[in-house]
Each structure stands twice: as structure tokens, then as C-alpha cells.
Regions:
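Short, well-ordered beta-strand elements
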Residues: 25-38, 55-61, 160-165
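N-terminal export leaders
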Residues: 6-10
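Short, Asp-centered acidic motifs that coordinate Mg2+ and/or phosphate
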Residues: 79-80, 215-217
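Acidic helix-start/capping segments at beta-turn-to-alpha-helix junctions
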Residues: 61-78, 85-90, 97
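Contiguous mixed-secondary-structure segments that line small-molecule binding/active-site clefts
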Residues: 85-178, 182-186, 190, 195-199, ...
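Short, polar/charged alpha-helical segment
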Residues: 37-56, 178, 182-184
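N-terminal signal peptide c-region/cleavage motif recognized by signal peptidases
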Residues: 18-20
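Short helix-initiation/N-cap motifs at beta->coil->alpha
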Residues: 37, 59-71, 168, 189-206
Length: 307
């Protein structure tokens, strides 16, 4: 090969390498979300605010539950999705650690664990706490003086008529229903649980509100907007069984390195999402039937994050 041919070959290699880099940088950021109401809301908010800041995305909202989402991001099938700090206890088998009951400490712990093991980066969290809860129909709670899970456990011990609507994840995970049962000394029989497809509390709350199949209680989240409006009361958790579940965007390090401004773009939005704000936004979807993307867009426009 003479010098001219060598030079031509080198130029071709350089051109191909440049094309490859450009193709990678032009590839859209794959944004996923969980299947529940708040997952859809947060997923759409992330997509809208990133697009508004010139970051190309592929919207993969409503993929599945925590297990599905974790599998997708660790396998590189998605780049980013909103997760909850308290799920670190389940993901990394640290359910017994008290660190998850503290918002800041729990965030720092999961941030370290996920980066060290999976090179997944936890960005700034929201101040909200979307923890798991059990909500009971108001007339049942009033008639039996049920205000806390301690009250509920004692009432169930006397043979109280109770049937819970919940997701499979809530029923199966050791840090969910099982943790409540252990802490408050009750055990539901299979016929006392109606397991519903997906993980959407809009469905479980509706089942309790409509007394579907005899249901009079529901799995709920701390930021659900439909609980009180549909005549349910959340049982207080005086023993603090559940971790703090602060929503936060998590992203593969490789994807973040390609566009570092993602962290800066998402931080102001998540800072605005306190508990009452998320309850109000979730209610628009759960109660008013508004589309999650519309609710997300309207909120971002009202805060000046979207034109």
C-alpha cells in the first residue's frame, strides 16, 4: 500500500469513527416509567422537560413494576426512569437497615450502592414521600375506631371483616404487606386479599370505593390524590414500618456522560414535587380522568419549565 492509499484508508477510518460518534450522540435517550399513575406522570414530565431543553427522547412510559424497570435499566434497554429511594432496601436486600427511614441517609445509601454495583446514577430527589400504605373505607374505620395499623391489627385479631385490594408486588414483597403484618401482628388469609393486575393504586382504591368482590380496604401510596375523595382513610403507621420513598430520576452513567446537562435540567422540576403537589397532580389523573401527558405539560407550563 503506497502513501496515498494509506492516507485514504486513514481518512476513511476517521470518517467512519466520526459517523459512529455522531450516531451515538444523536440516539434518543430512552425514558421509561412504572405502570402506576405517578409513574406515568413522572415519566411524561421527564420526557417533556428534556425535549424542551433540546434532548431527544424515546418515551417508554408504563413499562412495568419495579422488577421490570430494574431489569430494563441494568440490561441497557432503557437509559433513565423515575425510581423511589426506599426501593433500595428491596433492590439491595437491606430491608432491616434503619437507613431507609431517613430521607437523606436513604438517598445517599442507594446512590452509592447503585453506582458501585451497576454504574447507575441517582439524580436529585423530590421532597415527597410516596410510601406504601393501607387505606380503609371510611365507614369501616369510623365504626371500628380504626386510625392506625395497630388498631387494624387488633381489630383483625377479633375477627373483623376485612378484604384488601392490592398489587402482586405489594403482596409478594417482604418489605410491603408482609412487613406490615409482622409489625402489627396480623395475617391475612388468601381469601382476604384481591390481587389486581399491574401496580396502579387507582385500581386498588377504586375497588375499595366500589366494594368490588367485597373489598373494603386498598393498597395506597402516600401521594395518592384519590384516597379521601373516594371515601377511604389511610391508616397511620406509628412504628414507621415503611421506608421513605422519595421519587428521583435514575440514569445509566454512560447515558449521563453523553449529555451531562440532564442532571441540571431535571433538578428544578423534581424540587417542585412535594407531597401535596403530587397528590394534586395524581388526583387530576385518577379522579378527573385527565391524560398523564396533559397533566404533566400543564404543570410544567405553570411553573415556567415549558413554553
Amino acid at each position: 500500500m503506497n502513501s496515498i492509499q494509506r492516507r485514504a484508508a486513514l481518512l476513511l477510518v476517521a470518517a467512519l469513527a466520526t459517523d459512529s460518534v455522531l450516531a451515538q450522540s444523536a440516539a434518543p435517550l430512552r425514558v421509561g416509567s412504572k405502570i402506576d399513575t405517578e409513574g406515568k406522570l413522572l415519566g411524561n414530565m421527564i420526557v417533556l422537560v428534556l425535549e424542551a431543553n433540546g434532548i431527544k427522547t424515546e418515551n417508554k412510559s408504563s413499562l412495568g413494576n419495579t422488577k421490570v424497570m430494574r431489569g430494563a435499566i441494568t440490561a441497557g434497554e432503557i437509559d433513565l426512569y423515575p425510581e423511589y429511594t426506599g426501593n433500595g432496601a428491596f433492590i439491595f436486600s437491606e430491608e432491616s437497615s434503619p437507613v431507609w427511614k431517613n430521607a437523606k441517609a436513604g438517598y445517599e445509601r442507594v446512590k452509592t450502592l447503585d453506582y458501585d454495583k451497576n454504574k447507575i446514577v441517582w439524580l436529585e430527589p423530590s421532597p415527597a414521600n410516596n410510601t406504601w400504605a393501607i387505606a380503609v373505607r371510611k365507614e369501616v374505620a369510623t365504626a371500628n375506631k380504626l386510625q392506625t395499623l395497630d388498631d387494624l391489627g387488633k381489630w383483625l385479631g377479633t375477627g373483623g371483616q376485612f378484604k384488601l385490594a392490592a398489587s402482586a408486588e405489594f403482596v409478594e414483597r417482604s418489605d410491603a404487606l408482609s412487613a406490615f403484618q409482622t409489625a402489627y401482628s396480623f395475617k391475612l388469609k388468601p381469601e382476604q386479599v384481591l390481587t389486581l393486575a399491574g401496580g396502579d393504586t387507582a385500581v386498588t382504591i377504586k375497588a375499595a370505593a366500589e366494594k368490588t368482590s367485597g373489598v373494603n380496604a386498598a393498597m395506597a401510596y402516600g401521594t395518592d390524590g384519590a384516597v379521601a375523595a373516594l371515601g377511604l382513610v389511610i391508616m397511620d403507621d406509628p412504628k414507621g414500618v415503611q421506608p421513605i420513598y422519595a421519587p428521583a430520576p435514575i440514569i445509566r452513567e454512560e447515558a449521563l456522560k453523553k449529555n451531562p446537562k440532564i442532571a441540571m435540567v431535571l433538578a428544578p422540576m423534581f424540587k417542585l414535587l412535594d407531597g401535596p403537589t403530587l397528590q394534586g397532580l395524581n388526583a387530576k389523573i385518577q379522579l378527573e380522568g385527565q391524560d398523564a401527558k396533559k397533566v404533566a405539560g400543564d404543570f410544567l407550563k405553570s411553573k415556567g419549565l415549558l413554553k
